[in-house]
Amino acid sequence: MSQNKRTTVMKYLVKYKILLMIIAFGLWVVAAVMSSKAHAADNLVGNITKQQLFDGYPHFVSNYDDYLLSSDEAKAVEQLPSEISLKVFFGTWCHDSEREVPRLLKSFKRTNVSIDMISLDLNKSEPQGRAKEANIKYTPTFIVYHENVEIGRIIERPEVSLSEDILAMYKDSKAQK
């Protein structure tokens, strides 16, 4: 085979290889987008009850069952007034939420503290726009209210524990009055 023919064949093979790489990459992108959309469709978005959460997401149930409340956490919960309320923005797809939301639910299971849970999509939004209004950037975000006034936030994970951090926020808000 002459040098000219070899060069022509090599150019053809390089073009063919590049074309195959472009097609393979395009198929990979399409598959990734479809997989992401399928996963997102499985996630509840908006207001969600403890029962809905536990019915649809077994990781939350097992983390709830496995969590043992310390005596310090139990004491902190007991010291909170009933005027404390919580708004929890989280994702059923978020590993931090899978850890922290069950801990919160177990810590506050025997209190009159009101807990509103709002499940977010992968873009950290929900149809009513409450996440955007509350400037939610990370999940989970626990917004703590006393007498309907925001007194603090716990973002992704507490410093000590959820109940102890919430009690500290409450005490700080009282000291500032």
Predicted regions and their residues:
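Short active-site neighborhood of thiol/selenol oxidoreductases, capturing the structured segment around
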Residues: 82-92
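Non-catalytic, surface beta->alpha helical segment in thiol-disulfide oxidoreductase systems
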Residues: 146-176
